[in-house]
Protein backbone atom coordinates (compact mmCIF):
# COMPACT_ATOMS: atom_id res chain seq x y z
CA UNK A 1 0.00 0.00 0.00
CA UNK A 2 2.81 2.43 0.89
CA UNK A 3 4.65 1.66 -2.38
CA UNK A 4 1.45 2.37 -4.36
CA UNK A 5 0.95 5.74 -2.63
CA UNK A 6 4.63 6.68 -3.20
CA UNK A 7 4.37 5.80 -6.91
CA UNK A 8 1.20 7.92 -7.27
CA UNK A 9 2.92 10.93 -5.65
CA UNK A 10 5.99 10.63 -7.94
CA UNK A 11 3.81 10.50 -11.08
CA UNK A 12 1.81 13.56 -9.96
CA UNK A 13 4.97 15.58 -9.24
CA UNK A 14 6.40 14.69 -12.67
CA UNK A 15 3.24 15.90 -14.42
CA UNK A 16 3.35 19.21 -12.51
CA UNK A 17 7.01 19.77 -13.46
CA UNK A 18 6.33 19.08 -17.16
CA UNK A 19 3.41 21.56 -17.13
CA UNK A 20 5.55 24.28 -15.50
CA UNK A 21 8.33 23.84 -18.08
CA UNK A 22 5.90 24.13 -20.97
CA UNK A 23 4.39 27.31 -19.54
CA UNK A 24 7.81 28.88 -19.09
CA UNK A 25 8.88 28.43 -22.73
CA UNK A 26 8.83 31.91 -24.36
CA UNK A 27 7.23 32.50 -27.74
CA UNK A 28 9.81 33.63 -30.27
CA UNK A 29 9.16 36.56 -32.59
CA UNK A 30 10.55 36.38 -36.11
CA UNK A 31 12.88 39.21 -36.98
CA UNK A 32 14.40 40.50 -40.17
CA UNK A 33 18.00 41.51 -40.60
CA UNK A 34 18.53 45.29 -40.67
CA UNK A 35 19.57 46.91 -43.96
CA UNK A 36 22.71 48.81 -42.95
CA UNK A 37 23.38 50.86 -46.06
CA UNK A 38 26.04 53.15 -44.66
CA UNK A 39 27.20 54.15 -48.15
CA UNK A 40 24.05 56.23 -48.52
CA UNK A 41 25.22 58.61 -45.81
CA UNK A 42 26.13 61.99 -47.28
CA UNK A 43 28.14 63.33 -44.34
CA UNK A 44 30.71 61.69 -42.05
CA UNK A 45 29.51 60.98 -38.52
CA UNK A 46 30.15 63.82 -36.09
CA UNK A 47 32.28 63.08 -33.07
CA UNK A 48 30.22 62.50 -29.95
CA UNK A 49 31.39 63.18 -26.40
CA UNK A 50 31.33 60.23 -24.01
CA UNK A 51 29.68 62.46 -21.41
CA UNK A 52 25.91 62.27 -21.12
CA UNK A 53 23.61 64.69 -19.39
CA UNK A 54 21.09 62.17 -18.14
CA UNK A 55 20.86 58.55 -17.03
CA UNK A 56 19.06 56.08 -19.31
CA UNK A 57 15.32 55.77 -18.65
CA UNK A 58 14.44 53.07 -16.16
CA UNK A 59 13.51 49.77 -17.81
CA UNK A 60 11.54 46.95 -16.23
CA UNK A 61 12.62 43.32 -16.17
CA UNK A 62 9.80 42.36 -18.54
CA UNK A 63 8.17 44.15 -21.44
CA UNK A 64 4.87 45.81 -20.55
CA UNK A 65 2.68 45.34 -23.62
CA UNK A 66 -0.15 47.55 -22.37
CA UNK A 67 0.83 50.35 -24.77
CA UNK A 68 0.91 48.07 -27.82
CA UNK A 69 -2.24 48.93 -29.76
CA UNK A 70 -2.49 45.62 -31.63
CA UNK A 71 -0.92 42.25 -31.03
CA UNK A 72 -2.66 41.43 -27.75
CA UNK A 73 -5.72 39.80 -29.28
CA UNK A 74 -7.21 43.17 -30.19
CA UNK A 75 -9.45 43.38 -33.25
CA UNK A 76 -9.32 47.15 -33.61
CA UNK A 77 -7.17 50.08 -32.55
CA UNK A 78 -6.93 53.84 -32.71
CA UNK A 79 -4.62 55.51 -35.21
CA UNK A 80 -1.22 56.42 -33.74
CA UNK A 81 -1.49 59.95 -32.23
CA UNK A 82 -0.01 62.70 -34.38
CA UNK A 83 2.47 65.15 -32.86
CA UNK A 84 4.43 68.11 -34.12
CA UNK A 85 7.34 67.48 -36.48
CA UNK A 86 9.62 69.97 -34.74
CA UNK A 87 12.39 72.01 -36.36
CA UNK A 88 14.96 69.24 -36.86
CA UNK A 89 13.55 67.00 -39.60
CA UNK A 90 15.79 66.43 -42.64
CA UNK A 91 14.39 64.89 -45.81
CA UNK A 92 16.07 62.15 -47.85
CA UNK A 93 17.63 60.26 -44.95
CA UNK A 94 19.52 57.06 -45.84
CA UNK A 95 17.62 53.78 -45.92
CA UNK A 96 18.89 51.75 -42.97
CA UNK A 97 17.64 49.90 -39.91
CA UNK A 98 20.61 50.81 -37.69
CA UNK A 99 21.51 54.39 -36.79
CA UNK A 100 24.76 53.34 -35.09
CA UNK A 101 28.06 54.53 -36.55
CA UNK A 102 31.69 53.84 -35.68
CA UNK A 103 32.40 55.56 -32.37
CA UNK A 104 28.74 56.03 -31.41
CA UNK A 105 28.32 56.27 -27.64
CA UNK A 106 25.27 55.90 -25.45
CA UNK A 107 22.94 53.18 -24.23
CA UNK A 108 22.12 50.85 -27.11
CA UNK A 109 18.41 50.63 -27.87
CA UNK A 110 16.70 48.14 -30.20
CA UNK A 111 13.06 48.93 -31.00
CA UNK A 112 10.87 46.33 -32.70
CA UNK A 113 7.22 46.24 -33.62
CA UNK A 114 4.66 46.21 -36.37
CA UNK A 115 2.62 48.62 -38.44
CA UNK A 116 -1.09 47.74 -38.37
CA UNK A 117 -4.28 49.15 -39.83
CA UNK A 118 -7.08 50.17 -37.47
CA UNK A 119 -8.59 46.69 -37.88
CA UNK A 120 -5.24 45.21 -36.75
CA UNK A 121 -4.12 43.93 -40.13
CA UNK A 122 -0.33 44.11 -40.73
CA UNK A 123 0.89 46.61 -43.32
CA UNK A 124 3.69 45.46 -45.62
CA UNK A 125 6.13 47.97 -47.14
CA UNK A 126 5.06 50.78 -44.80
CA UNK A 127 7.50 53.69 -44.54
CA UNK A 128 9.09 54.46 -41.16
CA UNK A 129 11.37 57.52 -41.07
CA UNK A 130 13.18 58.03 -37.73
CA UNK A 131 15.29 60.89 -36.41
CA UNK A 132 16.51 61.85 -32.94
CA UNK A 133 19.11 63.65 -30.85
CA UNK A 134 22.33 61.89 -29.87
CA UNK A 135 23.11 60.76 -26.31
CA UNK A 136 23.95 64.38 -25.40
CA UNK A 137 20.66 65.79 -26.68
CA UNK A 138 22.20 67.25 -29.86
CA UNK A 139 20.73 66.89 -33.38
CA UNK A 140 22.93 66.58 -36.46
CA UNK A 141 21.54 69.32 -38.70
CA UNK A 142 24.27 69.14 -41.34
CA UNK A 143 24.36 65.39 -41.99
CA UNK A 144 22.37 62.26 -41.27
CA UNK A 145 23.63 61.02 -37.92
CA UNK A 146 20.74 59.40 -36.03
CA UNK A 147 18.51 59.70 -39.07
CA UNK A 148 17.26 56.92 -41.30
CA UNK A 149 14.23 55.41 -42.97
CA UNK A 150 13.14 51.83 -43.59
CA UNK A 151 10.17 49.78 -44.79
CA UNK A 152 8.25 47.04 -43.01
CA UNK A 153 8.56 43.46 -44.24
CA UNK A 154 5.75 41.29 -45.60
CA UNK A 155 4.42 40.83 -42.04
CA UNK A 156 4.44 44.54 -41.22
CA UNK A 157 7.49 44.10 -38.98
CA UNK A 158 10.27 46.65 -38.39
CA UNK A 159 13.42 46.85 -36.27
CA UNK A 160 15.41 49.97 -35.37
CA UNK A 161 18.82 49.93 -33.68
CA UNK A 162 19.91 53.23 -32.12
CA UNK A 163 20.84 54.70 -28.71
CA UNK A 164 18.71 56.28 -26.01
CA UNK A 165 18.55 59.99 -26.95
CA UNK A 166 19.63 62.68 -24.50
CA UNK A 167 17.48 65.52 -23.23
CA UNK A 168 17.61 69.19 -24.07
CA UNK A 169 15.86 72.30 -22.76
CA UNK A 170 12.12 71.80 -22.60
CA UNK A 171 12.14 68.18 -23.82
CA UNK A 172 12.66 64.78 -22.26
CA UNK A 173 13.94 61.70 -24.13
CA UNK A 174 12.00 61.12 -27.36
CA UNK A 175 12.37 59.76 -30.89
CA UNK A 176 10.68 61.33 -33.91
CA UNK A 177 9.01 59.20 -36.56
CA UNK A 178 6.96 59.50 -39.73
CA UNK A 179 4.77 56.52 -40.69
CA UNK A 180 3.03 55.96 -44.01
CA UNK A 181 1.32 52.93 -45.49
CA UNK A 182 1.69 52.55 -49.27
CA UNK A 183 -0.50 55.26 -50.83
CA UNK A 184 -1.72 56.13 -47.34
CA UNK A 185 -1.77 59.20 -45.12
CA UNK A 186 1.57 60.38 -43.72
CA UNK A 187 1.51 60.41 -39.90
CA UNK A 188 4.11 62.39 -37.95
CA UNK A 189 4.59 61.41 -34.31
CA UNK A 190 7.10 60.82 -31.50
CA UNK A 191 7.96 58.00 -29.11
CA UNK A 192 8.54 58.51 -25.39
CA UNK A 193 10.30 56.57 -22.64
CA UNK A 194 8.58 55.21 -19.50
CA UNK A 195 9.91 55.92 -16.03
CA UNK A 196 11.31 59.33 -16.94
CA UNK A 197 10.87 61.92 -14.20
CA UNK A 198 9.25 65.00 -15.67
CA UNK A 199 7.55 63.33 -18.64
CA UNK A 200 4.39 65.13 -17.62
CA UNK A 201 6.18 68.47 -17.94
CA UNK A 202 6.99 67.82 -21.60
CA UNK A 203 4.48 70.03 -23.37
CA UNK A 204 3.55 67.42 -26.00
CA UNK A 205 3.94 64.18 -24.01
CA UNK A 206 1.33 61.53 -24.87
CA UNK A 207 0.86 58.43 -22.71
CA UNK A 208 -0.23 56.47 -25.77
CA UNK A 209 3.22 56.92 -27.33
CA UNK A 210 5.24 55.27 -24.56
CA UNK A 211 7.68 52.57 -25.59
CA UNK A 212 7.46 49.22 -23.78
CA UNK A 213 11.06 48.72 -22.58
CA UNK A 214 13.11 46.02 -20.87
CA UNK A 215 16.82 45.67 -20.10
CA UNK A 216 18.98 43.52 -22.38
CA UNK A 217 22.54 42.20 -22.07
CA UNK A 218 23.98 45.12 -24.06
CA UNK A 219 21.46 47.92 -23.53
CA UNK A 220 17.69 48.09 -23.80
CA UNK A 221 15.00 46.46 -25.93
CA UNK A 222 11.71 48.17 -26.70
CA UNK A 223 8.48 47.51 -28.54
CA UNK A 224 5.93 49.74 -30.19
CA UNK A 225 3.20 48.97 -32.72
CA UNK A 226 2.09 51.79 -35.00
CA UNK A 227 -1.46 52.03 -36.34
CA UNK A 228 -2.42 53.71 -39.61
CA UNK A 229 -5.87 54.29 -41.14
CA UNK A 230 -7.35 51.27 -42.90
CA UNK A 231 -7.48 51.67 -46.70
Where in this protein do the model-derived segments appear?
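Beta-strand-dominated extracellular/periplasmic modules and repeats
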Residues: 37, 53-210, 217, 221-231
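Bacterial N-terminal signal peptides that target proteins for export
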Residues: 1-9
Amino acid sequence: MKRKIFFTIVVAMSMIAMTACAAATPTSIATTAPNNNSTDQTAPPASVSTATNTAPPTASSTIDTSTLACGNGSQSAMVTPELTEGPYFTANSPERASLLESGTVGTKLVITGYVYTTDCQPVANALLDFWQADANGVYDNSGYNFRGHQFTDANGYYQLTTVVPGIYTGRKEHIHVKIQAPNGKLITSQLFFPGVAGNDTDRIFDQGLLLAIQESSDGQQAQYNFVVPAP
